Amino acid sequence: MFALRSIRSATKAFQTTSIVSQRGFLQTTLKNVLFPTERQLRRQYLADNHIKVGSPEFDKFYEDLQPSELSKQSGLSDALLDDPILHICVIKYNKNIVQRYNLTPEQEKDIMENYNVSAGDPSLEQILPIPVPAHIFEELPIVKVLNN
């Protein structure tokens, strides 16, 4: 009798989990329970609409957006605050291109429109070993001409 009850309860449990998963219960619960932040909602909106960094839609999205409190305090745009990788790339770009070559805004615009410039990342050997070898230097920026 006990074995029969345990089999019934086990089959009942399996039946309910299949019904619950069919309704998407777990996906809905995870999205609603975690209380996403404004930043997460913006990132999700961009991902859902296939809006990539550097596209006109990306720029328009952040231009139309009211600046967040953190953006006002830090002086950085919400686009840079939302995507740390973009922030790092902009910093490296400014360090490696604008400051190093002392470009005017017109020259910088010309370079951005006509060339693809790498950020000049540090080498893996420079990042990993402790202490850092003295002979390791940053990679030079790689400039490729875009064929228009």
Swiss-Prot record:
- In chain numbering, the transit peptide falls at 1-24
What GO molecular functions are on record for this protein? cytochrome-c oxidase activity
Q: Does the keyword Translocase apply?
A: yes
Gene Ontology CC terms: mitochondrial inner membrane
State where the protein is found: Mitochondrion inner membrane
Looking at the record's lineage, which domain of life comes first?
A: Eukaryota
Ordered alphabetically, the record's keywords are: Membrane, Mitochondrion, Mitochondrion inner membrane, Transit peptide, Translocase
Question: Recorded E.C. number(s)?
Answer: 7.1.1.9
Q: Which reaction does it catalyse?
A: 4 Fe(II)-[cytochrome c] + O2 + 8 H(+)(in) = 4 Fe(III)-[cytochrome c] + 2 H2O + 4 H(+)(out)
Q: What does this protein do?
A: This protein is one of the nuclear-coded polypeptide chains of cytochrome c oxidase, the terminal oxidase in mitochondrial electron transport.
Q: Quaternary structure? A: Slime mold cytochrome c oxidase consists of at least seven different polypeptides species, subunits I, II, III, IV, V, VI, and VIIe/s in order of MW.
| UniProt name for this protein | Cytochrome c oxidase subunit 4, mitochondrial
Q: Which species is the source of this protein?
A: Dictyostelium discoideum (Social amoeba)
